[in-house]
Design a protein with these regions (language model features):
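Small-residue helix/turn framework positions
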Residues: 1-2, 6-8, 15, 20-86, ...
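A short, compositionally biased
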Residues: 17, 134-136, 252-254
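Long beta-strand-rich cores associated with HINT superfamily self-processing modules
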Residues: 123-125
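Long, domain-scale non-catalytic interaction/scaffolding regions in large secretory-pathway
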Residues: 129-205, 277
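Alpha-solenoid helical-repeat scaffolds
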Residues: 144-145, 153-155, 166-170, 186, ...
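Short boundary motifs at domain starts and secondary-structure transition points
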Residues: 170, 216-223, 309-314
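Intrinsically disordered, low-complexity segments enriched in small/polar residues
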Residues: 202-218, 296-310, 467-471
Length: 534
């Protein structure tokens, strides 16, 4: 839209001829005058001016899709341009040099920019009228600095497609936006929050008293992101580092088809963007979940250590329906896993969790929740492990050569404050029951905690190391076999109590009662040995 237009226009037989035009254009001034060197070439003009991005955003706010609007809203300042415009009956050509020094960008890395920092660009646009159909099509290219390339087109049917290349060649989808990216650092969480914002809406109180997390319908954004190819040396997703990540994603019928590969992640999944909570569904050949990241990326992509690692809001975690062939959690390697969750605001219900390997099958369910303010995370789990080879199960959880053989059943009902990956052991509560048989202790100082290492409670029963040679002789030594190992434990505020933990050996029965402080790893126990006399 042009305002306050001044100048001279000569109406000639073919096209209007502009001699000197000035106007207000998106909050800035624009000037159009005939090129002084174009006496023999009609329709060539010098074009210069400036655009205020606030006015530009206001104009297009209701004319573009939600994702394009999110991108525009992250820009501020103004853009200067200078170049030429060529007009003919069938063709419009624009060639501009861009002054982007006064442009500011709050987009995540690598597209952030401070106002006042030097940046230039070039923009070329061409529009062609087809005489036979009277339809017009357009195409354009742009170069922003040394790293960003753009290509776009608008066909005669009004379908727009645009490719963006960041340190890579642009990739053009059939419609919408395609991004091809190579970067040293990329925070996927920041980009996802920008392009897929969640809003909280409340339905009729008579229908539902709790707030419902809803989405802005971005999967129907026809001019939004449709293709993403990325190769990132240091990627952050779910506040975790994923090195050397290659990602290929395409939006098909509103569903993202994603193929990912990294030393910590490989497989194919669907990411379904939907009202309420998104869904991640598919199969991974491997998933190694690292510890949460303690670094953020500052200006220029330089890593900066933050005092407290950023946590992922529970309501931003999608529902999961995954099959994982090889699951690792930090240094632990439990095996294959199946997980299915169902989300409601402030709560993730773990409907089905199955961890399978040659040594055991563990099945479970549970809940991960926060309060109405999104704080005070809490977990409860109901687990049952059918142990086929206790020694190999313990080896999976990081303590090889502690026990040989052993089979049976371990059940646990546990709860604590904090997320599942960072429990507050001072709040640990619940019950554990152990019923195992036919095993052999290879390390008497390894701790019976290793017996239930499958639950990551290595310190829970550390008292049962039975390294008590001084008073009990050689009743229990390295290589001692046990016929039965059983007991029940009640846990409250991180303190586990038992009255009936015992081990049946060929030569004796060992009975233990007392308590263990899990966070402090201290114990107060009474151990009684009943020798077997032939």
């Amino acid at each position: 839209p042009f305002y306050k237009v001044h100048g001279t226009v000569r109406l000639i037989e073919e096209l209007p001829q502009f001699e000197q035009i000035s106007a207000e254009f998106f909050g800035g001034a624009v000037s159009l005058k005939q090129n002084v060197g174009s006496q023999n070439k009609k329709g060539l003009y010098d074009l210069s001016g400036k655009v205020d991005l606030t006015r530009l955003k206001n104009h297009f706010s209701d004319k573009v899709g939600a994702q394009s609007r999110q991108l525009l809203n992250a820009l501020n300042g103004n853009i200067g341009f200078k170049g030429n415009l060529a007009l003919s009956n069938n063709l419009t050509d624009v060639n501009l040099n861009l002054d982007l020094n006064a442009l500011g960008s709050n987009l995540p890395q690598p597209l952030d920019k401070k106002r006042g920092s030097n940046l230039t660009g070039q923009f070329k646009y061409q529009s062609v009228l087809n005489d036979s159909t009277s339809n017009r099509s357009s195409q354009w290219t742009a170069q922003i600095g040394k790293n960003i390339s753009l290509q776009g087109r608008l066909n005669a049917q009004g379908i727009m497609s645009q490719g963006i290349g960041i340190d890579a060649s642009p990739v053009m989808p059939d419609s919408g936006i395609g991004i091809n990216l190579q970067a040293n650092d990329l925070n996927v969480d920041d980009w996802h929050s920008l392009l897929y914002p969640k809003i909280v809406a409340t339905k009729n109180p008579a229908q539902r008293s709790a707030p419902e997390v809803s989405q802005t319908g971005l999967s129907r954004d026809v001019d939004g992101l449709n293709v993403l190819n990325a190769s990132v040396r240091n990627a952050v997703a779910l506040n975790r580092q994923w090195p050397n990540l290659t990602l290929n994603a395409k939006l098909v019928n509103g569903i993202w088809q994603i193929q990912a590969k990294s030393p910590r992640l490989e497989g194919q999944v669907q990411y379904i963007d939907r009202p309420g909570f998104d869904l991640v569904k598919g199969k991974l050949s491997r998933l190694n979940i690292p510890e949460s990241s303690s670094k953020v990326f500052g200006a220029g992509g330089k890593p900066e250590t933050q005092a407290t690692p950023k946590t992922v809001p529970l309501n931003s975690i999608p529902e999961l329906d995954l099959v994982i062939d090889q699951l690792s959690i930090n240094q632990y390697k439990p095996g294959a896993a199946v997980i299915k969750t169902l989300n409601i605001p402030n709560k993730i219900s773990i409907q089905n969790l199955v961890i399978t390997n040659a040594e055991a099958i563990t099945k479970g369910s549970g809940e991960w929740s926060v309060d109405a303010q999104g704080s005070n995370e809490a977990i409860w789990l109901d687990l049952k492990a059918e142990i086929k080879d206790l020694g190999r199960v313990i080896a999976h959880w990081g303590s090889p050569k502690a026990v040989e053989g052993g089979k049976g059943l371990v059940t646990a009902k546990l709860d604590w404050s904090g997320p599942p990956y960072d429990p507050d052991l001072d709040t640990l509560g619940g019950k554990i029951a152990i019923a195992l048989e036919n095993g052999r202790l290879l390390q008497v100082d390894s701790g019976i905690a290793k017996v239930i290492g499958v639950f990551s409670l290595q310190s829970l029963l550390k008292f049962a190391s039975f390294d008590i040679q001084g008073s009990l002789g050689n009743v229990i030594t390295t290589g001692t076999s046990f016929n039965k190992l059983s007991g029940d434990f009640v846990i409250r505020n991180g303190v586990a109590r038992t009255q009936n933990f015992g081990m049946q050996l060929n030569q004796a029965r060992v009975a233990t009662s007392g308590l263990v402080n899990v966070p402090k790893q201290t114990q107060d126990l009474r151990i009684t040995i009943f020798p077997t006399i032939d």
